[in-house]
Amino acid sequence: MGVTDIIKDFDKLKGQKLVYGSQGKTSLDAVPILAFDMLGLPVNVVYGMKGRKAGRAAILRGETTIDYQTTASYLKHVKPLVEKGEMVAVMTWGAPSGGEVSRDPNFPDLPAFPEVYEAVTGNKFKGTEAKSWTALFYAGFATQKYVMLPKSAKKDVVKAWQNAAAAIVNDPAAMKVLNKKLGKYDQVTGSKALKSALKKATSIDSKSEKFLQSWKDTK
């Protein structure tokens, strides 16, 4: 494609035949699909992928031309290809920071989606579309992999699990392994922090919800 910088080469990217292999519009893929629309990229979304592994295989076979992978998958499977010059990483979805979506700390040299949006559209990352995308982002990426217990679990059992999670987060040896495999992100532990994160991941304003319902029906 000849695209190495999504902002500088954006017009070149828009002129390409872009095909994305998706798991479904109500899956995590709602995040990239809406992002493509917001950027005005002419992406042909092909449904039927069984997972991002299948999506990765499709782009490696040349069946698709644009893809995304989670940090863990990228570090293990895609980064070596980037280093060989066989793939190009152009942006991340970002990471929560101070109430905003900023650059992912694991990829500080890559712009986050909100940054790309503002640069190529000339608009601030605000309004219903931006709020809708951010709600999807928090639900799909920023807060995930919760450890859940039955509501009937006794307090001492809940406390034991909370203490175990905190012990892992505070164990440098354990975190070294996790950070290497999954990427270095802040881990959420403790009842208060978890409730706050869960609320953000499961809440959406009515205007954004209405927009997403309508948008989904067009895909």
Q: What do these predicted ranges mean?
A:
Residues 1-61, 122-131, 140-177:
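Hinge/capping helix and adjacent helix->loop/strand transition within the periplasmic-binding protein
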Residues 6, 77-169, 210, 215-219:
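C-terminal lobe and pocket-closing loops
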Residues 16-118:
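Ligand-binding pocket segment of bilobal, Venus flytrap-like solute-binding proteins
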Residues 39, 63, 71, 82, ...:
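Sec/Tat-exported extracytoplasmic proteins
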Residues 94-104, 113, 166, 174-198:
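Mature extracytoplasmic/periplasmic domains
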Residues 172, 189-219:
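Extracellular/periplasmic bilobal clamshell ligand-binding domains
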